[in-house]
Amino acid sequence: MMNYLKGGEFLIKETQAQDIFIREEFGEDQKMMLESTQDFNEREIRPVLTRFEEKDYALVESLMRKAGELGLLGVNVPEKYEGLGMGFNTGMLICEEISSLTGSIATAFG
């Protein structure tokens, strides 16, 4: 069972060195989700980057729906709420990657 952080707890909670999440220690699930997110970025976001500057809200809505269908929006949501239940670290990994091309997606993603 995953130990979920509550709210902004990660900002003030004391962290042990062995609990720090580094790329060299990604599990297979994290690698798979990262690869899926990178594919999503290249296939769906990169080709339409210039449209973000035009404030195309329908585009952002469409992309967020597609991200949701892939499970990218529910990575760290517990399974009992129909998320993937992969935990905080995996959620942050996906957030970092999906936000890497444009701040608009970073803002929409949360």
What residue spans do the PLM features occupy?
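Short Gly/charged-rich anion-binding patches and loops
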Residues: S36, S62-L63, L93
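Intrinsic disorder at enzyme termini
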Residues: M1-D29
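A generic secondary-structure micro-motif detector
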Residues: G27, F52-E54, L84
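Generic non-transmembrane alpha-helical segments
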Residues: D39-P47, K66, L70, E97
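Short secondary-structure junction/hinge motifs that connect adjacent elements
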Residues: V48-E69
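Internal helix-loop-helix
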Residues: E69-G110
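A non-catalytic, amphipathic alpha-helix used as a structural packing/dimerization or gating element
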Residues: E28-R43
